[in-house]
Amino acid sequence: MELHNLSSPSPSLSSSVLPPSFSPSPSSAPSAFTTVGGSSGGPCHPTSSSLVSAFLAPILALEFVLGLVGNSLALFIFCIHTRPWTSNTVFLVSLVAADFLLISNLPLRVDYYLLHETWRFGAAACKVNLFMLSTNRTASVVFLTAIALNRYLKVVQPHHVLSRASVGAAARVAGGLWVGILLLNGHLLLSTFSGPSCLSYRVGTKPSASLRWHQALYLLEFFLPLALILFAIVSIGLTIRNRGLGGQAGPQRAMRVLAMVVAVYTICFLPSIIFGMASMVAFWLSACRSLDLCTQLFHGSLAFTYLNSVLDPVLYCFSSPNFLHQSRALLGLTRGRQGPVSDESSYQPSRQWRYREASRKAEAIGKLKVQGEVSLEKEGSSQG
């Protein structure tokens, strides 16, 4: 996601600061930041920081190398050494595909920041670059949420039809999600870009419905999935406690997976949300110095956003025992030959929980029988 400057009568994030999901408006021309109403307070003119460019260029280069190595290893393991696939594997592979969208475009962003935010590859390449970056963010959020909800179904609703979905059904769900993700970000391929910069939004002098929609979508992409993930964590925790699943590997691993999902989610996407909203508040308050600082911090937070391609392989280790085992084997960290490790663990209630439930049912049935006998005795005595 890219952000850069604010400039319109309504509060909005600027092109160097706004994520790619904020589509450029063909009718709007680039302009400086203005105060609310663009009047008496005078315009705000935040400057591009060479310090931010100097920070982002090497960081993104390092993320490219680490992300390429980690995700190449992940793709190799999932495609060659993972048999059979499960619904969880389908969503993990989709996350790998999303990461490669980012990794393949990071070298162009590194070059962009090395040249102090000067794009030299043409408008068509700029459109594709911003489209891929935006698609990566949306896909990462969507499939992290899908992984969390898949774990929720396995633990909390083990007998639900969705919990027993086949690999083919999971693949169709993932395909449908990809179609929606591409449609949400396709506007970037139809937008017009000019000038030396390659930014996802050029703010004009008039606010547009498109801008407000994309701002709302940007926030919704963060808060709605986060709410679903937290709901899954709380539900799984309560289920583990109530059903006595604490001693089973599957439910415990599900909790670790969701904890890792939350960690990746907050580390990668929360900084841009915080500084983006701070930029909007500074814009509303016509605080030019604060606005300049917040937009530069937002721009720098792109390093965290792009970090998801590095952290996702760590998530795969938590989510798939087979992936962890195969990774250790390929890296020479295990001794001897071991059979494949199944990713499917038991999520059924423990023996103690089943015993308690059976006792409760037997007790309830006994009470019903006693009540029935009492009622029969009353009827007999009344007839006599």
UniProtKB/Swiss-Prot annotation:
Composition bias type Low complexity, residue spans: 7-21
Cytoplasmic face of the membrane: 80-87, 153-172, 237-256, 319-384
Region (Disordered): 1-21
Protein name: Oxoeicosanoid receptor 1
PANTHER family with a match to the protein in the record: HYDROXYCARBOXYLIC ACID RECEPTOR 2, OXOEICOSANOID RECEPTOR 1
GO biological process: adenylate cyclase-inhibiting G protein-coupled receptor signaling pathway; G protein-coupled receptor signaling pathway
GO molecular function: 5(S)-hydroxyperoxy-6E,8Z,11Z,14Z-icosatetraenoic acid binding; 5-hydroxy-6E,8Z,11Z,14Z-icosatetraenoic acid binding; 5-oxo-6E,8Z,11Z,14Z-icosatetraenoic acid binding; G protein-coupled receptor activity
Positions of disulphide bridges: 126-198
Functional summary from the UniProt entry: Receptor for eicosanoids and polyunsaturated fatty acids such as 5-oxo-6E,8Z,11Z,14Z-eicosatetraenoic acid (5-OXO-ETE), 5(S)-hydroperoxy-6E,8Z,11Z,14Z-eicosatetraenoic acid (5(S)-HPETE) and arachidonic acid. Seems to be coupled to the G(i)/G(o), families of heteromeric G proteins.
GO cellular component: plasma membrane
Main location: membrane
Compartment annotation: Membrane
Organism: Homo sapiens (Human)
Transmembrane segments: 59-79, 88-108, 130-152, 173-193, 216-236, 257-277, 298-318
Pfam families: 7tm_1
Keyword vocabulary terms for this entry: Disulfide bond, G-protein coupled receptor, Glycoprotein, Membrane, Receptor, Transducer, Transmembrane, Transmembrane helix
Protein's membrane topology: Multi-pass membrane protein
Family: Belongs to the G-protein coupled receptor 1 family.
